[in-house]
Amino acid sequence: MNVRAIVAWTLYDFANSAFAAVIFATIYAAYYALAVVGNDGGAGDLWWGRVVSVSMGLVAVTSPFLGGVADRAGIRRPLFIGFTALAVTATALMSTVAPGMVVWGFVLGVLGNFAYESALVYYNAYLPDLAPPSHQGRVSGWGFAVGYAGSIAALLAALPFVKAGNYAGAFFATAALYAAFSLPAFFMLPAPPSGRVPVLRAAREGGAQVVATARRILALPDLRRFLGAYFIYEDGVNTVIAFSGIFAAQTLGFPMERLIALYIVVQISALIGALAWARPTDVLGPRRVVMITLCQWAAIVVAAYFVQTQGQFWALAVVAGTGLGAVQAASRAFLARLAPPGMEAELFGFYSLCGKSAAVMGPLVFGGISHAAGGNQRAGILAIGSFFVVGLALLSRVKAGGKAPRVASS
């Protein structure tokens, strides 16, 4: 294994986790819903749900097509760099969003999250190039663990600005961290073969390739079943991440400083979860690890419905963090285990398609139920539990994902 490339790959997880933590999960999410929109009657929940759903929908439509183009034309790296730069730019521009600027904040939220998620398609596709199947679980776990450390660093960097009421400074600091720690990946990750197909020709053939890939997935039962299950349960994970900060601030009265501290504690527990489950993912198989953590997630959202105090929510958040690290790392390793050679970028495009198109529904469900209930977020969070239960039932039908190194294509 190329140690330098693996280090650069994990540092990118450190970088993009700044966006995930500060923008998507805590500061910008709460600032937009509560200050920019105002959450009277659940209006902020509804608008933030639209930000998440529209951006994820764009990723769902484009990611498999762009993944196919990357494989055929050998332009994975330029697309990876370009989408990262777009996400960094959108993050910096969030400093211009003031209370009442609902549409501008919506546009930047959609643009930033779309670019962030699109870059992840190419980032994830590097995993089979960096490690053999027997080590992909632990390398994936290392990446998520370093990513959680990046979340903590970004929140600590933003905290002084938030305490001073300088949200613009917090967003600028996040953009700077995102850019700086992305640079090693730009230069050290292995370059795929270039010039196999001209870019324009690859673009013309991309649509046909997407259809062909879909048919090939349908012909591989375990791959098809895994992606179907992932479609459902990742919807629940993304929705909880998108709304947990707003739920804590609105329903339980967390101030912004305490919300940041809460998220840091969650990241520490998630880091522990990712590291603790890295080797068991290889030994037990990613299928079993994902199923265990889905049971954990279902119990967590039910418990969240009944939480009444901030102390209870602190305890629940720690438990949720360990499950977050495990389910994300094991799911990525699961797909790497199932991906036939030569289809990695395209299949990770479908991986993103399943997770992000499903996330179109979850945020709309939460926001819609909260708004219909006059701002009662407890009903919304309880409804998300169904995504974990259904995902678990579907995943139980997947036979692969144990100790076998890779499922052969047919």
Name each model-derived stretch.
Residues A90, M101-A119, Q312-A326:
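Hydrophobic core of transmembrane alpha-helices in multi-pass small-molecule transporters
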Residues G41-D45, P160-A176, G368-F388:
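A membrane-interface helix-boundary motif in multi-pass transporters
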Residues A180-M188, L382-S410:
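Multi-pass alpha-helical transporter architecture, strongest
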Residues M1-V7, P192-G228:
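Juxtamembrane intracellular "pre-TM" segments in multi-pass secondary transporters
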